[in-house]
Swiss-Prot record:
InterPro entries: GLA-like_dom_SF, GLA_domain, Osteocalcin, Osteocalcin/MGP. Its main location: secreted. Ca(2+) 2 binds at E66, E69. This is Osteocalcin-2. Gamma-carboxyglutamate residues are formed by vitamin K dependent carboxylation by GGCX. These residues are essential for the binding of calcium. Carboxylated in a Ptprv/Esp-dependent process. Decarboxylation promotes the hormone activity. Bone. The lineage of its organism: Eukaryota, Metazoa, Chordata, Craniata, Vertebrata. Residues 1-23 form the signal peptide. It is found in: Secreted. The gene is Bglap2. The carboxylated form is one of the main organic components of the bone matrix, which constitutes 1-2% of the total bone protein: it acts as a negative regulator of bone formation and is required to limit bone formation without impairing bone resorption or mineralization. The carboxylated form binds strongly to apatite and calcium. The uncarboxylated form acts as a hormone secreted by osteoblasts, which regulates different cellular processes, such as energy metabolism, male fertility and brain development. Regulates of energy metabolism by acting as a hormone favoring pancreatic beta-cell proliferation, insulin secretion and sensitivity and energy expenditure. Disulfide bonds join C68-C74.
Length: 95
């Protein structure tokens, strides 16, 4: 068993150290795998455009939240039940 393991290891080492990795395939198929730098830059630049907004959009409920914070009753209710419910109970307006 020990000799079989040693032979397998030596065969694997010989395979790794052989010059098969330096061989290049011949034919037109080998050129299709690579692209020029200009084509590669076009692909990279195209993907960067769709990253999204650089800053987050403003919260639409921020003015409502500020108005509710100024009223102590609304502020207390918003802590217990949530902003929408508290604003509706105090001001009677649906957000």
């Amino acid at each position: 068993m020990r000799t079989l393991s040693l032979l397998t290891l030596l065969a694997l080492a010989a395979l790794c150290l052989s010059d098969l990795t330096d061989a290049k395939p011949s034919g037109p198929e080998s050129d299709k795998a690579f692209m020029s730098k200009q084509e590669g830059n076009k692909v990279v630049n195209r993907l960067r455009r769709y990253l999204g907004a650089s800053v987050p959009s403003p919260d639409p409920l921020e003015p409502t939240r500020e108005q509710c914070e100024l009223n102590p009753a609304c502020d207390e209710l918003s802590d217990q039940y949530g902003l929408k419910t508290a604003y509706k109970r105090i001001y009677g307006i649906t957000i």
